Amino acid sequence: MRNFKSSLLAGAIIFASASPTLAEEDGMMRARIGLSSNDFTTLWSGGDLKTDYMSLNLGATYITPSAFYFDLGFKQDTSASWNTVELTDDFNDGKDEDYTRDDLTVTIGKVLDNGVQLFAGYQDSSATIALPEISWVQEGSVEEEEMDVSGFFLGVGKSFKVGEGSINLNLAYGIMDGTLVDAVGRSWDSTDGDGYSLGASYTRFLTESFSLNFEVKKQKYSYEYDTGGATILTSGDDEMTMIGANLVYQF
């Protein structure tokens, strides 16, 4: 029978734990696969973008006997398109354009006896934004823009046992840098941007080896760009809302 510490460990790392004996003596390895619905909006000086898409989520976690953990996560869109925030017909006759995105996250952390966890990590998000034909047929322009955002984050969370499962709440602060390759192939680098991430998840055991995890996350980051006096791009604001579900297997 799982004890209180084991359930908190499961929720804190967003995966289900098996017996506390494994957690305390041998360590644990888990793999996960899932899907998430993502709502992403970015606003910058000179334009905006909005996309709603599904992504495939893959990940693996190793938990040491002393409740330190290392997590590797990867997300990739399954099919995505973008338009302006207001969806006006003035842009591309109201038609959507292709959008691709992948996110890589590495996290290390420690789960304490009271269900509190401290964690830190690195995230890299890369996106390709297809441009309307009317914009790239002009001389010197390209068919797509590229956006890369990467940086480090620190966070804290707390897990609570609820029936047969556990709820986890977490908050993180990130320092991120953005790089944009624009419609004429110029690369713009931001100065340090920052922002926050708020998350909540519910984890429930199905068997000794399988569990289900449901999660929701809100992220918001802002950037300033040093464009050497150019007025086309000076700042940017990104906002992401994610709702997902994962199936987790413990080896």
Where are these regions (language model features)?
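Flexible, solvent-exposed loop segments that connect beta-strands
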Residues: 41-49, 78-99, 126-148, 178-192, ...
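Repeated loop/turn-to-beta-strand initiation elements of outer-membrane beta-barrel proteins
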Residues: 31, 66-72, 114-118, 164-169, ...
